[in-house]
Structures are given as structure tokens and as C-alpha cells.
């Protein structure tokens, strides 16, 4: 979403508090008639045409700095008083009554401060109105003062207005509020809240659960086992969690909803922690190693680490990365994270232009510096030059050659050449792996001329070359595999999947000579690279792709056995590859690929793969593949609109012993909790006779882990 910098309003008033000048400050060239500022002008002040001024008050200024700036803006050389009708600025009464120089009272103590604008005016990011009056036009001229403007502020503002049209303010904000409170709701309060949700009929999903030992949080159709015995969860209309409480604490994501629901309840609230962290994703990358060329202490304080900034009051920390910014604040200030992101983007545009290729480092998990690097006797990394030598021959629009050197010009106008002091690596070529993965033309220096290479033809002459020919050389497992390559499987899976299969290799190398069928690793078909960074990414991919995935020494299956497809994927350096069977005749270099024998892994799945009815009644059937009503799979989200009670589930010794061989494949901090989750999802519906547990388990879970696969 594109961030819009809100307009600001400066009002200069006279002796009778009449408006003499109304300055509409904006970095844009027009009035935003939908803005709250314009509505305030038109509806409350009856001003239709204010002065449009292309300037911007920095919200990071102290009151003395702000007063100097406003004097410069209005060209006033006299003492002035600044104030606001919404918040106290320079002066405030001890009881926080809003200060107004025209209605001053001596009955209350008046305090003066030099705080930062965004602290004393919390809504300033969206709505800032400042009133200015000459001190001599009030009854308290002694409260006025004159401040010289800081020229660095004016210089920065001028540069800001110059670069503003080119700023990409398309950002996405993720926030993490530590919005957990201690409360006295208890079970009685939670019951009142859920009753109010149902009485209001507001279509919010709600769930109140209480269990004897472990709380099972039902999110959609999934069970999540927690140690809480009592829990209330309410979801917004878009499915996000609005609030959750165990009666003693409450986590609030939707403040308005919570306030409405507890309006008739005497709640006691104590914030446990107040820090808020925002992660702001940027549409256009920035330079994370920021360097300021002018004095900007009125905005940021630079730290010893050049990608970390502090606000001037040191209460807001900002960590810069190429594609996102993390902002941590002590207290909630509306949209302050967007405003500071705007300032960071602006400063990057002013002082830290990003050369997309000059500082190129990696694509996905592959680093340029590791593949094209200088060593003692090899100088393979190209250098950047600023001009072409006279007399160089133009080979194409982006490639020039002379007897002494070759020059490649990338899409950003950066010129690369090779100048090996030893006179060996002086031929410009391109790295195949980057071109195969992302069609990037990343230069490197070679011993011999590269013009006959297909990647050279694509990068220099824009000739598309089909990568249909696959090299018969098989790489060791662990490297990212491109379209023209293949690699061995990891040793454990090579031995398992290729049991009984052979591949004849040429002596002294890894060139495939002949095979009637052998499992290897290939890149996935298509141009899109799938990258899985976390366990959550892996699980989501497997369930959506509905195929088996190998990650290190683990095998991931889709949740439902009937969903398992006929492909096998494998993760290498976070990138998804495909397991295939390769076939090759000794008399030909032609290589053919066939689907893998997926059943070898699928048969390891411990669940019964044939849909078997477990229990049925009145058109409702519970099977090993789901719950059906009148033949239709029931997949409605669980809700407190439908209430049921169950006894606490206890994992018997017989069940635990039966599944114990499987536990070495299960990631769990508590095996007993794992058994209970399994029991809740399946066994509780079977009405299992304690004396007949083993036969029932063998019927539905034949692969308990005891059977040895030969």
C-alpha cells in the first residue's frame, strides 16, 4: 500500500484570534480534498482556499527548533507563541488542560517543555494543526520568544522536496504489539463476553473452551494443544485473531471490539509489556548501510553500526535491511512507523543511491563472490570502469571489444571489464547458474573467449537458447541444480530409492555411461523457483503441492494420505528440486527422464491409505479420511455456536507402547502431549474398548514403526 504523506496546517492569528494566514503544507502539488485537514479548514474555519506551500514540518523537531522553523516559514522576526487546539505544545498546565494564550489563567501552574513534536502531538502523522501568534498580540507577551532557524533543517527540507517525486512509498507494514494485559476477567467475565458476542449477532467467530488438564485450541479444523485450561478466542471478520484470554491475561489485537464487548464489565487491565515492533516491507530496495552527508541530528542519531539508527530522543530504534525496515517503539504512536520509513527512504534517495549491480552479492542462496572470486593466481572478479576506451569495437548494444580488453554494460549502465595483472583471465563471460536460475547476466573473467557459449549469446546478443541438452556428468549432492545439470541423491536416500538399480559411470569421473533407470535430482520444471526458508513454509508447501518432500534426512507427507501425489521433491539450499529416474544408453548421450518410484516412500506413511469407515449414525460417517455428512465432507470451521463437552483424554500405556517406535520420527517436546493430540483427532471417536486396543490400532495404523523395511 502506498503511504500518503499527510498535509499540515499552520494558522497565523491576530489579536482577536482571527486567522490572518492559513498555510496548507504538502509535498504534493495539490490540495487533498478528502484529507481531515481540508475538512477542518472548510467546516470549522470556513476557509476554502488556503495558501498551498510545498514544505513539510518534520515531526522529529523539538519545540525550540519548531518555533525557529515557523518563524522562518511565516517570515516573522518578533517573539511568537505556538499552540494547538488538540494538544499542548510548548506550554501545558499541570492538569493537562489545553493551553491557549488568549484564555490564560493564573489559577493553574503552567509548565514549559522542549519535547519532540511527535511525542507531544501523538496524532501528528495524520493531522497536524499549529497556531502561531505574535506574543505582543496576547495578554501574556512574556511567554513569547524568538528562535533562530536551524539552517540544516531548511537544507534538509529543500532536498526532501526535491527528491520527493521520485520516492517509492509503496510499503507493507507488519506489527507485533506486545499487547498482553493482566486482567480479572476469570471464567465469569469470559462467559459474559461470549454471551455478548452472540447477543449482538455480529458474525464474529468465537470459541470458549475449558478442559481439565490441557486446553485444545481449535483454529479452523486444526487442534493445537496448549497448557491453558481455559481460553476464549474471538476472530475478526477476515479470520484474524481479535483477542484471546485465559481469564488471567488477555491479548488484544482489536481494541475497539474488546472495548465494546467489556463495556458493561468492570475490568482491571495492566499492560505486561509496552514495546511495539513494526516490520515494514519495501517495494523498492534501499541501501541498508546509511551514510548522512549533512547534519541530521534533528531526525536521527547515527550509531556505531551503520544499519542501525536511533530517533533523537533515543526511544525509537530503526534497523535497516535492503528490502525491509524494523522499527521498535516504546509506546503506540499512530502511523509513526510509516512516517519514519518515509524519512529513511527519502534519506536513501538523497545520500545513498543504490547501484543494483555494483553491489550485487547473491541470487537466492548462491553467492557471486563464492563462484567468481579472486585467489592467489586467479583474478576472476571483474572491475567497474567509468568510460570506454577510444577505438573499441561495438559487438552489440551492451558489449565492446578491443585487442586489450572486453567491456560489458548491464541494464543499469554499469560497465564491467577484466584486467588481470597476470594477463590470464581477461575474457568477459557470464555465470551459468545465475542465468539459468533468474536470467541474470552476471559477468565473470575467464581464460578463454566465451562468445561461443549459449549464456554469452543470450546476454550479449539476446538470443534465447533452449536448455534441452542435459550434461551426463552427475554432480555431488548439495549444490543447486540448474536445467542442464543433475546430481546424486543424499547417501541415505540414494541407497534406499536406488536399491536394485545401477548406474554405470566412466572410470575416474562422474560421467554417466549407461543406466536402465536410476533416481537422481533435477531442477523443477518451469521458470519459477520455490524457496522454503522455515518449517512453516515446508509444511504449507507440502499440503498445498500434495507431494512428498525430502528435507535433510526427513520425509514430509501431505496431511491426508489420499492426497499424496506421484512426485518426490527434495530441498537443496532452501530451493525445491525434483527427484526423477534417469535412463541413458551407452551408445548415445541422449538422456531421458521419468517419474520416480514414489510408492517406495508413500508406503512408509503410517496411516491407513484406504478410506475405511470408523463409525456411522444418521447419515454421519467418520472415516480414516475425514468426517462426512450425507456423503459430503464436513469442513466447517469449529465455533462456540456448537458446544460439546468431553472427558479429559488419557493416553493409555498400551497406546503409548504401540506408537513408541514412531517417536524417533516425531519432533515433540512432550511425547505424551503428542499422543493426546493424536487421540483427540482419531481415537476418541472410535469408542475403543480398552481390552481391544491393539487390534484396533493395527487395523487403522498398520505401520506403527515396528515393521522393518528391507
Curated annotation (Swiss-Prot):
It comes from the Viruses. The keyword S-adenosyl-L-methionine does not apply. Pfam families: Pox_VERT_large. Its main location: virion. The keyword ATP-binding does not apply. InterPro entries: Poxvirus_early-TF_lsu. GO terms for biological process: positive regulation of DNA-templated transcription. GO terms for cellular component: virion component. GO terms for molecular function: DNA binding. Keywords: Activator, DNA-binding, Late protein, Transcription, Transcription regulation, Virion. It is found in: Virion. Acts with RNA polymerase to initiate transcription from early gene promoters. Is recruited by the RPO-associated protein of 94 kDa RAP94/OPG109 to form the early transcription complex, which also contains the core RNA polymerase. ETF heterodimer binds to early gene promoters. Belongs to the poxviridae VETF large subunit family. Heterodimer of a 70 kDa and a 82 kDa subunit. Part of the early transcription complex composed of ETF, RAP94/OPG109, and the DNA-directed RNA polymerase. This is Early transcription factor 82 kDa subunit. It comes from Vaccinia virus (strain Copenhagen) (VACV). The gene is OPG133.
Amino acid at each position: 500500500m502506498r503511504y500518503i504523506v499527510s498535509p499540515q496546517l499552520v494558522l497565523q492569528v491576530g489579536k482577536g484570534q482571527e486567522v490572518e494566514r492559513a498555510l496548507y503544507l504538502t509535498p504534493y502539488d495539490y490540495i487533498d480534498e478528502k484529507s481531515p485537514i481540508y475538512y477542518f479548514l472548510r467546516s470549522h474555519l470556513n476557509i476554502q482556499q488556503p495558501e498551498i506551500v510545498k514544505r513539510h514540518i518534520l515531526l522529529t523537531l523539538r519545540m525550540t527548533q519548531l518555533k525557529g522553523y515557523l518563524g522562518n516559514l511565516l517570515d516573522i522576526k518578533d517573539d511568537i507563541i505556538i499552540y494547538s487546539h488538540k494538544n499542548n505544545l510548548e506550554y501545558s498546565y499541570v492538569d493537562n488542560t489545553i493551553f491557549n494564550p488568549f484564555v490564560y489563567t493564573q489559577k493553574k501552574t503552567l509548565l514549559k517543555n522542549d519535547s519532540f513534536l511527535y511525542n507531544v502531538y501523538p496524532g501528528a502523522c495524520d493531522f497536524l494543526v499549529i497556531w502561531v501568534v505574535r506574543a505582543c498580540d496576547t495578554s501574556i507577551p512574556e511567554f513569547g520568544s524568538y528562535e533562530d532557524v536551524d539552517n540544516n533543517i531548511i537544507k534538509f527540507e529543500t532536498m526532501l522536496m526535491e527528491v520527493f517525486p521520485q520516492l517509492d512509498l509503496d510499503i507493507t507494514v507488519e506489527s507485533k504489539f506486545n499487547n498482553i494485559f493482566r486482567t480479572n476477567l476469570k471464567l465469569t467475565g469470559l462467559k459474559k463476553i461470549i454471551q455478548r458476542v452472540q447477543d449482538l449477532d455480529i458474525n464474529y467467530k468465537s470459541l470458549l473452551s475449558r478442559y481439565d488438564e490441557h486446553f485444545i485450541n481449535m483454529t479452523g479444523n486444526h487442534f493445537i494443544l496448549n497448557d491453558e485450561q481455559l481460553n476464549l478466542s474471538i476472530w475478526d471478520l477476515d479470520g484474524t485473531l481479535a483477542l484471546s484470554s485465559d481469564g488471567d491475561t488477555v491479548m488484544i489485537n482489536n481494541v475497539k471490539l474488546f472495548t465494546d464487548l467489556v463495556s458493561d464489565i468492570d475490568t482491571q487491565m495492566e499492560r505486561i509489556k509496552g514495546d511495539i515492533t513494526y516490520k515494514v516491507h519495501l517495494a523498492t530496495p534501499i541501501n541498508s548501510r546509511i551514510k548522512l552527508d549533512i547534519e541530521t541530528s534533528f531526525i536521527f542519531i547515527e550509531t556505531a553500526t551503520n544499519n542501525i539508527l536511533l530517533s533523537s530522543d533515543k526511544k525509537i530504534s530503526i534497523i535497516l535491511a535492503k528490502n525491509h525496515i524494523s522499527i521498535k517503539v516504546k509506546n503506540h504512536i499512530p502511523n509513526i512507523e510509516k512516517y519514519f520509513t518515509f524519512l529513511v527512504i527519502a534519506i536513501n534517495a538523497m545520500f545513498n543511491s543504490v547501484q543494483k549491480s555494483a553491489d550485487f552479492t547473491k541470487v537466492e542462496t548462491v553467492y557471486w563472490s563464492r563462484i567468481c572470486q579472486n585467489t592467489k593466481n586467479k583474478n576472476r572478479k571483474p572491475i567497474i570502469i567509468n568510460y570506454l576506451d577510444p577505438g573499441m569495437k561495438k559487438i552489440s548494444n551492451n558489449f565492446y571489444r578491443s585487442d586489450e580488453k572486453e567491456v560489458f554494460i548491464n541494464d543499469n549502465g554499469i560497465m564491467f571489464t577484466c584486467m588481470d595483472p597476470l594477463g590470464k583471465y581477461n575474457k568477459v563471460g557470464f555465470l551459468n547458474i545465475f542465468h539459468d536460475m533468474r536470467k541474470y547476466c552476471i559477468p565473470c573473467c575467464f581464460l578463454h573467449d566465451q562468445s561461443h557459449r549459449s549464456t554469452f549469446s543470450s546476454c550479449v546478443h539476446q538470443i534465447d537458447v533452449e536448455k534441452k541438452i542435459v550434461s551426463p556428468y552427475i554432480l555431488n549432492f548439495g549444490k543447486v541444480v540448474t536445467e542442464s545439470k543433475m546430481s546424486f541423491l543424499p547417501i541415505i536416500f540414494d541407497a534406499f530409492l536406488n536399491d536394485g538399480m545401477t548406474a554405470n559411470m566412466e572410470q575416474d569421473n562422474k560421467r554417466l555411461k549407461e543406466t536402465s533407470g536410476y533416481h537422481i535430482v533435477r531442477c523443477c520444471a518451469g521458470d519459477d523457483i520455490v524457496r522454503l526458508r522455515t518449517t512453516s513454509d515446508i509444511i504449507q508447501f507440502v499440503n498445498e503441492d500434495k507431494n512428498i518432500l525430502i528435507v535433510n534426512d526427513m520425509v514430509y507427507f501431505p496431511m491426508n494420505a489420499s492426497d499424496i501425489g506421484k512426485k518426490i521433491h527434495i530441498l537443496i539450499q532452501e530451493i525445491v528440486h525434483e527427484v526423477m529416474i534417469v535412463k541413458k544408453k551407452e551408445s548415445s548421450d541422449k538422456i531421458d527422464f521419468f517419474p520416480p518410484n514414489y510408492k517406495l516412500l508413500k508406503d512408509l506413511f503410517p496411516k491407513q491409505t484406504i478410506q475405511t469407515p470408523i463409525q456411522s449414525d444418521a447419515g454421519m460417517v467418520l472415516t480414516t479420511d475425514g468426517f462426512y455428512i450425507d456423503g459430503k465432507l464436513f469442513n466447517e470451521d469449529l465455533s462456540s455456536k456448537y458446544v460439546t463437552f468431553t472427558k479429559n483424554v488419557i493416553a493409555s500405556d498400551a497406546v503409548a507402547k504401540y506408537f513408541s517406535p514412531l517417536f524417533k520420527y516425531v519432533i515433540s517436546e512432550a511425547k505424551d502431549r503428542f499422543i493426546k493430540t493424536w487421540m483427540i483427532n482419531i481415537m476418541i471417536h472410535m469408542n475403543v474398548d480398552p481390552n481391544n486396543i491393539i487390534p484396533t490400532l493395527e487395523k487403522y495404523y498398520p505401520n506403527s514403526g515396528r515393521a522393518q523395511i528391507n
